[in-house]
Amino acid sequence: MHPTHIKVLTPNSKDLDILCVALSIVKTLDQINDFKILVKQALNQGFDINMKDGDHCTLLYYSCTLKLYEIAQFLLENGADPNIRNTVYDQITPLSVVRTQPKTEQSIYLTKLLLQDSLLKLCQNNDFKIIDNSITVKDIEEFIDWRMSISSKNNEFISYHLKELHNLQNHLVRNTKFSNSEIIQKLDSILITAEDYNKSFEQLPEQLIDKTEAIEPELTGKVAEVISETA
């Protein structure tokens, strides 16, 4: 459902209502900056950036749906959780939303950020070192570094780590100690098969891959340039 039609059912409903409506009309760089100020003000007053509306969607989910990638990065930097699903309709995460959108320099970069943040939160919230015969925090950190690269030369390495994450998930499911663990749900929300990963980028032009590979982890300004050129 579009942000302007949300049904707010939460303690900070007024703030969420205002922010969702403001987000739905953002088009220019000035409006992006104004929205960031609104979010900062709300956060200073105790607003929960991961709050869901009546349709169980977060601000991060809506910003990805509306292709407002700079705002999505801003929300991630301020604590937005990319692992939260839209639990009423399609049951997907912000990452799933961006994956289905046309491959552009900005959308690919945001995909990288969402993947990185998802896996980092997984590392921070859980000590994988206690799990025998599985991956360690070091493995995941290494995986994140390589996952940020989309060039074909790294596909074999990335595929290996995707399989490792699936092995971890299977291990947790079989182990009664972790059978009801939230870790399993989080893994399920971010995992794709190695085959699906490779398919995601096999049709990309080499020029776009080269440009995206060169982008440093800082989106601010990139989307602004595109907006100013098309406004």
Swiss-Prot record:
Pfam families: Ank. Keywords: ANK repeat. ANK repeats lie at residues 55-87. InterPro entries: Ankyrin_rpt, Ankyrin_rpt-contain_sf. Disulfide bonds: none annotated. This is Putative ankyrin repeat protein RBE_0555. It comes from Rickettsia bellii (strain RML369-C).
